[in-house]
Design a protein with these regions (language model features):
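Glycine-rich phosphate-binding segment of PLP-dependent enzymes
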Residues: 1-3
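Phosphate-binding glycine-rich loop
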Residues: 5-48, 57-66, 72-74, 139
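Short amphipathic alpha-helical/adjacent loop interface patches that line ligand
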Residues: 12, 53, 84, 265
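Alpha-helical structural signal in soluble globular domains
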Residues: 14, 62, 66, 90, ...
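A short beta-strand submotif of the Rossmann-like class I SAM-dependent methyltransferase core
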Residues: 26, 51, 100
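Hydrophobic residues in well-ordered beta-strands that form the structural core
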Residues: 51, 72, 124-126
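Active-site phosphate-binding strand-loop segment of PLP-dependent enzymes
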Residues: 78-160, 165-176, 183
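Active-site region of PLP-dependent enzymes
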Residues: 132-137, 147-267
Length: 268
């Protein structure tokens, strides 16, 4: 774990092969990855971005704090993914981007979404935070839209304490994204190590039971935080070598993890 020189390059290569996407740029979080993509595509204040009405609140908060015009589109009741019919109704020539969220591991109907978006001159960004491994018509999520972003944060299929990634087959966008990330501050491995130790302690069954109420109260406070302005500078941090080392280990074990998740889902 500590012999982590060149691990960033190795993890990017492995994840690129896994997603079957030419370019991968690692970031400090999934939110940071989306921030980088929006900047790389050159979206300006006031530009319209379409998102599903049911999705991670952090994405909405980021878009509003970057001063984009957010337009909500209904979701399908079967999958909670973007409704094709409502997208057709809501999209306009003012729409610059459509964020397609693969909710709960269910891939969106990406061919239809892309056709509609491109007909109106809009780009399609996949939110693949909850959907590593899933495929749509033989292709992995994260390689279906114009670009995509992943999260490696708490509760995700791959957890590197925090972290995220941009994936794209567009060389120009990849270059811009890498230039943006290169100017970010370097996080220290010490903070990552401390969080890793705390994770192991908290996830002990007895300790988690004692701390459960406090953890739930902290999660509920997130709704109040939505009223606050997001500190965009907090997104401008680099993914560390230590996180890359953790990511490599987790990616190698992902099939095993997914088998356990599938087995556990049978209890629901």
């Amino acid at each position: 774990l500590f012999n982590s020189r060149n691990k960033l390059i190795e993890f990017e290569r492995m994840f690129s092969e896994f997603v079957d996407c030419e370019y991968v740029i690692l970031t400090s979080s999934g939110t940071s990855a989306l921030y980088v993509l929006l900047k790389a595509y050159g979206l300006k204040k006031g530009d319209e971005v379409i998102v599903p009405a049911y999705m991670c609140e952090k994405v909405i908060r980021l878009l509003l704090d970057m001063r984009y015009k957010v337009k909500l589109v209904d979701v399908e009741k079967e999958t909670y993914n973007l409704s094709i019919d409502d997208l057709n109704e809501k999209i306009s020539e003012n729409t610059k981007a459509v964020i397609a969220v693969h909710m709960f591991g269910n891939p969106c109907r990406m061919d239809e979404i892309s056709d509609i978006a491109h007909d109106h001159g809009a780009i399609v960004i996949e939110d693949s935070a909850q959907c590593i491994c899933a495929e749509y018509k033989g292709k992995k999520v994260g390689s279906l839209g114009d670009s995509a972003f992943f999260s490696f944060g708490e509760g995700k299929p791959i957890i590197t304490i925090s972290g995220g990634a941009v994936t794209t087959n567009d060389k120009k966008i990849a270059k811009k994204a890498r230039e943006i990330v290169s100017k970010f501050k370097q996080k220290t491995n010490g903070k990552i190590l401390l969080k890793l130790i705390l994770y192991y302690i908290i996830k002990n069954r007895r300790i988690y039971k004692l701390l459960y109420n406090k953890i739930q109260k902290r999660r509920m406070k997130r709704w109040d935080e939505l009223k606050e302005v997001m500190n965009l500078d907090s997104l401008k941090q680099k993914f560390t070598d230590m996180q890359a080392s953790i990511g490599i280990i987790q990616l190698r074990k992902l099939k095993c993890f997914n088998k356990i998740r599938y087995k556990n889902s049978m209890f629901l």
